[in-house]
Amino acid sequence: MTGLYIHIPICISRCRYCDFYKMTPNEWDNVALFLQSLELEFQRLPKDFAPDTVFIGGGTPTALEAADFSIMLDSIHRHIDLSNVVEFSSEANPGSLTPEKLAAMKEGGVNRVSIGVQSFNDKALRLLGRTHRARGAIEGYHMLREAGFDNVNIDLIQSIPGMKPEDVLADARQVAELRPEHLSYYNLIYEPGTPMTRDRDEGRLIPPGDDEEADNYFAVKKLLEDEGYGHYEISNFSRDRKHCLHNVLYWQGGEYFGCGPSAHSHWKGKRFGNIPDLKVYCDRLQKGESPVDMIEVLDPKDKARETLVMWLRMTEGLDMDHFQSVTGHHVDMLCGDAIGSMIEEGLLERLENRLALSSGALFVCNSVFSELV
């Protein structure tokens, strides 16, 4: 499988925890120039590129007006062979959803929408700097259903300061009541330079302790599994195995192109990234130049170790023969000693030809992964 990621670097406002590259309308209002430049980048992709998955992220894709969304989707169809696409996703924010935008998505082939709820707790939403509230999130979800989308993901954030265990479970219960096909349940990360990180460093925010975070994580896991959700990746749950195929491609070492400012690609043994500057990105493409700002030639063994770590994020683990066919390296030859030690410690499990994290290691996976790379 191969994938296409498209980065829309526009947000209505800046969330207090986010360090993704984006600009607000006050900083950049020439959407037409961005869309023209994005189309020029599509034209630079290999002519035989035919992705299996497409993911439009950001930023906030639904910060685009409906007409602009249609222009972007039309340019994708004009320049990229979508005949193999089985999943075409777009992110959306509750505060910028409209029936017109959803109609444009539907008409343009989008068949999966990921809505950035983050919490159904209004106090938590204010702390995160989100522009919507719980009622708006629920209304946005129902708007998606009314528009005919039958594959919907809800994003939630865990470990939000001030959230009591009962608040955390209330968020999970609300998800179970809405019954989306998929839930992404990400840990709050304090990125350098963000307002929330400054508040934490200066003592205005106190994150929950590790034990409380772990208890909440496993309580949510149990609640969702009791409601019919399969826990298929450390931070992801799905009903009826409606996994996010685009992310599965990432986790299993697949190749992909990224378009848009700051987007990254992995193709033919190289990793490359576009410049994280919207103005320079547009200037370069308008001049017929490449927006690529970074190229890394991947060492095959390093890439195999990276793929091992990503693949182990999936709860079913990996088939070691399949892993070898994908990477050209057997797991035991890459890091057999470290794997043996972690099996003895109960962090990894090996059953016949399959290697996986133990259930107890799900919340401490980073310490496991650091031993494997």
Show where each model-derived region lies.
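A short, conserved structural fragment
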Residues: 343-353
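C-terminal scaffold of the Radical SAM
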Residues: 1-3, 22-45, 49-329
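Short amphipathic alpha-helical interaction segments
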Residues: 329-341
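Minor-groove-contacting beta-hairpin "wing" of winged helix-turn-helix DNA-binding domains
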Residues: 354-358
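Local cysteine-cluster metal-coordination motifs and their immediate loop/turn environment
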Residues: 9-22
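Short active-site neighborhood of thiol/selenol oxidoreductases, capturing the structured segment around
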Residues: 4-8
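Short, amphipathic alpha-helical interaction segments positioned at domain boundaries
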Residues: 362-373
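Auxiliary N-terminal substrate/complex-recognition segments of SAM-dependent methyltransferases
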Residues: 100, 212, 336-337, 363
